[in-house]
Amino acid sequence: MREKTVIAADLGASGGKMAKGSYNGSRLLAGDFFDFENKPIELNKNLYWDLFALYNSILQGTVRYSQDCEADSISVDTWGATYGLLDSKGRLLEPIYHYRDLRTEHSMERMYQNVSREKVFQLTGCQPARSYTLPQLYSYVEHQERILDLADTMLFLPDLLTYFLSGEKVTERSIAGTSGLLRLDQEDWCYELFRMLGIQTDMLLPLTEPGTERGMMSRRIADSLNIKQMKVISAIGHDTASAVAGIPYFGVGQVYISIGTNINMGVEVTESVTGETAFRGGYKNAAVMEDRKILYRDFAAFWLLNEFQRSCREEGCSYSYQDMMELASAAKARSVFVDTDDEILNNAGGNIKEKINAFLERSGQETLTEDADFIRCILESIALKVKYCTEYLEKELHIPLHKISVINGGTRNYVLMQMISDALARPVYCGLPYATLTGNILTQLYALGELGSVDEMRDLSGRSFSMKEYHPVEKRKEYWDSGLQKMMEKGVCK
């Protein structure tokens, strides 16, 4: 067979990545990774994504990969919930808001005055955070803005970039599932919720399946880049769902933990899981591909480390990720933890060390002074949250688990990987630092007819890539068990 070559772009909240994937019929090669910056823009007290810088970076990567071969296709996945509004002529109506923009600071509480949190979960299977599309759209209603009346089309970020590349407007189902706006079965929009909140629906498109060709890259773009046209594919637009689709031999009874700016962790299911226990545990449902869904929780992870780096730079001290791992390894375990879901810790700006100490003081814990202790506190808090969520799946939702797979860029943090293994008191399999790109590439091969199912995608991933196994240190089990018990009593882990 002729070797297939595809280009994958993955936009994360902290940065973008691209790769070229080559498939010869038996093994997949993914390489020539190209990283680029995703730097938000603050303007007049609002926070925006630099959409056109991201788009230009994708074009640069496309040129790079087209120098020595003709690519068959390209696809883009992104973080969830971010959207763009277009007018009837296909023009953007406003800049693309960052999900941490403060215009939604009070939108959740006001939204729940109209429709209860429980009702939203019953209708959608989702428990939106402030960063989700639902509260962002409700903020227009809350502030009596007319922007939705002017909008002809709403496109989520991967669909918006697909539109830029091909001229085709579509809404792919997995990325729409990050919005908090779909029905419980994840098959269509929850029009009842739109009506209850007074959000108009004229800008919505029908949902389409991932792994579908969307036409060719526009000739104008190809000519301007001096490259051959290629197919544009809607892969699995939601970055986490894309990563899950590419985990080697993943399936029932396994937990995935995708670590980057945020953690998204959960299990794969065929039917949405609802009920009081799932609701109380903060779990949500979202679509992946075929009839597969994920039951998951998400919370901040390296966002806190990024904020720590920023705060230290403002104080005149610069730490690399390697520096932080070494400091954390050398620091004493103090058994102090923060809730990575805490709203104040997740607001942009301010000094994260001051925010952490304020949280520790409020929760009756020892405050910190040394940078190494702050770093260790952040990492241990992430590991403790993972432990809490994993035990909730097993003990409260009664989902038997026999394997833990940790994926994406966070797996490079060997200190955190060992902490997670120790906290869970079981082996964890870590790897695929570019798992989302891998899933993107595999889904393109599916769309091109080279693979026939998600199972075949995962089998190919298993034949092509290896995972590193971390084993727990038995003597540390008591530290994590007592830490979780203490934090649950204080209401820190929830």
Predicted regions mapped to residue ranges:
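A conserved helix-loop-beta module that forms one wall/lid of the active-site cleft
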Residues: 197-210, 441
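Carbohydrate-associated surface elements
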Residues: 101
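Short glycine-rich phosphate-binding loop at a beta-alpha junction
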Residues: 70-79, 153, 206, 398-408
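Short beta-strand-loop/turn "lid" adjacent to the catalytic site in phosphate-handling enzymes
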Residues: 63-98, 127-131, 162-183, 206-209, ...
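Short acidic-aromatic active-site loops that bind/stabilize oxyanions
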Residues: 47-55, 126, 130, 207, ...
